[in-house]
Swiss-Prot record:
Source species: Chromobacterium violaceum (strain ATCC 12472 / DSM 30191 / JCM 1249 / CCUG 213 / NBRC 12614 / NCIMB 9131 / NCTC 9757 / MK)
UniProt keyword list: ATP synthesis, ATP-binding, Cell inner membrane, Cell membrane, CF(1), Hydrogen ion transport, Ion transport, Membrane, Nucleotide-binding, Translocase, Transport
Catalytic activity, reaction form: ATP + H2O + 4 H(+)(in) = ADP + phosphate + 5 H(+)(out)
Gene: atpA
Lineage, broadest ranks: Bacteria, Pseudomonadati, Pseudomonadota, Betaproteobacteria, Neisseriales
Subunit structure comment from the entry: F-type ATPases have 2 components, CF(1) - the catalytic core - and CF(0) - the membrane proton channel. CF(1) has five subunits: alpha(3), beta(3), gamma(1), delta(1), epsilon(1). CF(0) has three main subunits: a(1), b(2) and c(9-12). The alpha and beta chains form an alternating ring which encloses part of the gamma chain. CF(1) is attached to CF(0) by a central stalk formed by the gamma and epsilon chains, while a peripheral stalk is formed by the delta and b chains.
Family that this chain belongs to: Belongs to the ATPase alpha/beta chains family.
Gene3D superfamilies noted in UniProt: 2.40.30.20, ATP synthase alpha/beta chain, C-terminal domain, P-loop containing nucleotide triphosphate hydrolases
Name used for this protein in its record: ATP synthase subunit alpha
């Protein structure tokens, strides 16, 4: 094709006229030093606290210390390729992670990137990891139950949707097991679960994923993993990333449950970053703002009202409340709940489930200490039938523990004390539950009803759990309609109670305790 000179000049003129002029204005700085993932930068006069910075090699960092003549930043990931003299650019953005239903069923890192080998996640939306928690006016009181499927928790320390309930205990006391049971129990309830693993071994996280897949719970779960081998910065931001993913569901009028496993390791990662940034250390060498680290995270778990959901969705969702329930986990050292981080988180949350090593080793699992475990707001959210039948459980256990201590010294006990001890022993036995064997509201109510009616008084303590399991199987087979009615209404009617009394009578008559 021949072009004459005048056509060439016309083409060039047209190109020049249509050129999109857009000079990029970005503040640049220079790396002064790199040590342990902390970068000191000269320049960047306009940088903001928490702003994302771009390093060479498509690496990003967070500006954390804004000083007179330098900026202290933490690198998100590998930093070996960054060296003195490298150029750093401000991005003008704060850190965002992908959010939405596309993440459900996937395992992602602290930045929301998939690490499960199942291909990319094509999320339509992203959200900043740091957000201000809903205000008082936007909230609604906690009044709907978040069933864990564990008898001891749902009867003594109930959790409501939008609550923050701390799970606290030494290592190897079953903290993660309680949280996983709560996640598995949400199957079919329409609750999206987020499990945030901070500072754990990659093998432990792989085991959690396998267990959730086995029990069909990965279909409603997102896993955010920041393993022990990853940078402290990623362990520090992982809970905030998980929270942003949960907030998406809360803000569209759905219910979500988030487990932070565990916040002790996040505090340690934050302490490491702060000390490397040369921030002044305080108690236990933690920085002064370690309380704020957890309070700004846990305050984002809330139940928001219909008006707020309508406002956040632009009127697309009407008449629905949304909730984000948090189960933070804290690991104690030798049962010391008065240490710095445990006391902080206890004061932030709406109650705690305290797990004890002695109970765990004695075979009482979940190893819940009924005396100091409380739920400050969950009582209002408890299912009617469980509230009615489970009221005496905590009292029976507390009295049993007290009397058992005295009974060691006293040889001759009166009849009333002996009865109380026997009752407490049976209740303690019945509160035991194997992992991954969660119960529905009706099945739980059945056990509590039988305890209240004194049906276990002539059952040997060692046989109580076997008797309970067989009676449940019998009712499931012959009176499934009663269980369905209790699950649907959340209450036990007088007629259904008569049916259960007859069922118990006939079952006991044909039951052999040998």
């Amino acid at each position: 094709m021949q072009l004459n000179p005048s056509e060439i000049s016309d083409l060039i003129k047209a190109k020049i006229q249509n050129l999109a002029e857009g000079a990029e204005v970005r503040t640049k700085g220079t790396v002064i030093s790199v040590t342990d993932g902390i970068v000191r930068i000269h320049g960047l006069a306009d940088v903001m606290q928490g702003e994302m910075l771009e390093f060479p090699g498509n690496t990003f960092g967070l500006a954390m210390n804004l000083e007179r003549d330098s900026v202290g930043a933490v690198v998100l990931g590998e930093y070996e390729h960054i060296s003195e003299g490298d150029e750093v650019k401000c991005t003008g953005r704060i850190l965002e992670v992908p959010v939405g239903p596309e993440l459900v069923g996937r395992v992602v890192n602290a930045l929301g990137q998939p690490i499960d080998g199942k291909g990319p996640i094509n999320a339509q939306k992203s959200s900043p990891i740091e957000k201000i928690a809903p205000g008082v006016i936007a909230r609604k009181s906690v009044s709907q139950p978040m069933q864990t499927g564990l008898k001891s928790i749902d009867s003594m320390v109930p959790v409501g949707r939008g609550q923050r309930e701390l799970i606290i205990g030494d290592r190897q006391t079953g903290k993660t097991a309680v949280a996983l049971d709560a996640i598995i129990n949400q199957k079919g309830n329409g609750v999206i679960c987020i499990y945030v693993a901070v500072g754990q071994k990659a093998s432990s996280i792989a085991n959690v994923v396998r267990k959730l897949e086995e029990h069909g719970a990965m279909g409603h779960t997102i896993i955010v993993a920041a393993t022990a081998s990853e940078a402290a910065a990623l362990q520090f931001i992982a809970p905030y990333s998980g929270c942003a993913m949960g907030e998406y569901f809360r803000d569209i009028g759905e219910d979500a449950l988030i487990v932070y496993d565990d916040l002790s390791k996040q505090a340690v990662a934050y302490r490491q970053i702060s000390l490397l940034l040369r921030r002044p250390p305080g108690r236990e060498a933690y920085p002064g703002d370690v309380f704020y680290l957890h309070s700004r995270l846990l305050e984002r778990a809330a139940r928001i009202n219909e008006e707020e959901v309508e406002k956040l969705t632009g009127g697309a969702v009407k008449g629905k409340t949304g909730s984000l329930t948090a189960l933070p986990i804290i690991e104690t050292q030798a049962g010391d709940v008065s240490a710095f981080v445990p006391t902080n988180v206890i004061s932030i949350t709406d109650g705690q489930i305290f797990l004890e090593t002695d109970l765990f080793n004695a075979g009482i699992r979940p190893a819940i200490n009924a005396g100091i475990s409380v739920s400050r707001v969950g009582g209002a959210a408890q299912t009617k039938v469980i509230k009615k039948l489970g009221g005496g459980i905590r009292l029976a256990l507390a009295q049993y523990r007290e009397l058992a201590a005295f009974a060691q010294f006293a040889s001759d006990l009166d009849e009333a004390t002996r009865k109380q001890l026997a009752h407490g022993e049976v209740v303690t036995e019945l509160m035991k539950q194997k992992q991954f064997s969660t119960l529905s509201t009706a099945e739980m109510a059945l056990t509590l009803w039988a305890v209240n009616k004194g049906s276990y008084e002539d059952v040997p303590v060692k046989k109580a759990l076997a008797f309970e399991a067989e009676f449940l199987a019998n009712v499931r087979a012959n009176h499934a309609d009663v269980l369905q009615a209790v699950n649907a209404s959340g209450d036990l009617s007088a007629d259904n109670e008569k049916v259960l009394a007859k069922a118990m009578e006939s079952f006991k008559a044909g039951y052999s305790f040998n």
